[in-house]
């Protein structure tokens, strides 16, 4: 796997879970002898919603809700076979989306 790179993109609503998962991935990759660049925090995507409080009248009375999506990006440079096996066996918490690309 010479001159290849693994790009990992993490996505979660809770920043603590995503930071914990990123730390586990970095620790696993460094333990197997790979070089890790990151985790790089990407801009947080914020979706805001306005919902009417009353089902009938009072149009001006609304609740405002938001969903924040946190993203992290990291590259593993020159991964070994042990690195790939360790990453496949890694158990990450529920609520963290993982996207892996081999470049």
From Swiss-Prot:
Would you indicate the residue range of the signal peptide? none
Q: Which GO BP terms, alphabetically? A: translation
State the GO CC annotations: ribonucleoprotein complex; ribosome
| Keyword check for Ribosomal protein | yes
Would the keyword Ribosomal protein turn up in this protein's UniProt record? yes
Q: Which UniProt keywords apply?
A: Ribonucleoprotein, Ribosomal protein
This entry's Gene Ontology molecular function terms read: structural constituent of ribosome; tRNA binding
Quote the InterPro entries the UniProt record gives: Ribosomal_uS10, Ribosomal_uS10_CS, Ribosomal_uS10_dom, Ribosomal_uS10_dom_sf
What is the stated purpose of this protein?
Involved in the binding of tRNA to the ribosomes.
Q: Which family does it belong to?
A: Belongs to the universal ribosomal protein uS10 family.
Assembly mode = Part of the 30S ribosomal subunit.
What is the designated name of this protein? Small ribosomal subunit protein uS10
Native organism is Polynucleobacter necessarius subsp. necessarius (strain STIR1)
